[in-house]
Amino acid sequence: MIDSLSWQDLAQAKRDALKNSIPKNWRLEQVPSPEHLQNGVEFVESNLSPEERQITELPLEVLRPALQAGLVSSKEATLAFAHRAALAHQLTNCLTEFILEDALRRADELDIYLKETGRPVGPLHGVPVSLKDLFYLEGTDTTVGFAAWLNDKAMIQDEAGVVKILRNAGAVFFVKTNVPTSMMCAETVNNVFGFTNNAINRFCSAAGSSGGEGSLLALRGSPLGI
C-alpha cells in the first residue's frame, strides 16, 4: 500500500501522524497567525501551568543537579518540556517526531533507578534532550527532509553514536526537530514537514540547518538540543 502512494501522500500522512502524536489536551483549538502573534514566547508561557513553567525555565546547570538529586523527577521534567515543545511546534512547525510515550517510559525507568540505588545513571540523568533530524534514533524516521526516506526503518542499521552516548549518560529523547532538505540550505524547509518559522518573529525564517532546534530552544521547548 505504501509503495503505491505518492510522495505527497506519504508526506501528508507523516504530518498527520505528527499532529496526532500530540495529546489532545495540548492541541490548540486555533493557532494564531503571525499577523496576530509575531513573538511566540509569552503565548507559550501563558499556556503552561505554574509548575510546568517553573521547571522549563530552569537553566540546564540548575535542572541537571535537581534531576540527579531527585528534587525534580525525570517524568515531571519530560512532561513539562514535552508540553512546551508541543506548543512551540504548533506556532513554528519545528518538530519532525514527538515521541512522548517512549520518553515517559524511559523517564519512569530513570526515576525508579534513582529511587532504588540513590544515584543517577549518568551526568545527564533524566534530562529531556531534543535531536536534530539527522541522528538515527530507533523507532523514528530520519528523513533529513527526503520523502523517499519516510517509513524506511530498514535504512537505519544502527543508532547514531551520539544517541548511544547521550542515552548512556541518562538522556531522555522526546522530540526530533526539522531541518532543510539534505541540510544543504540555510532555510529550514523541505517537502515532508514544510517551513519552520522563527520563534521570535514568526514572519521570518528560522534559518538553518538547525532551524527546528533554534525555534524549539528559543521557546524553551527543550533544555538541551543536539
Language-model segments: residues:
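Gly/Ser-rich catalytic/binding loops embedded in alpha/beta enzyme cores
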Residues: 2-226
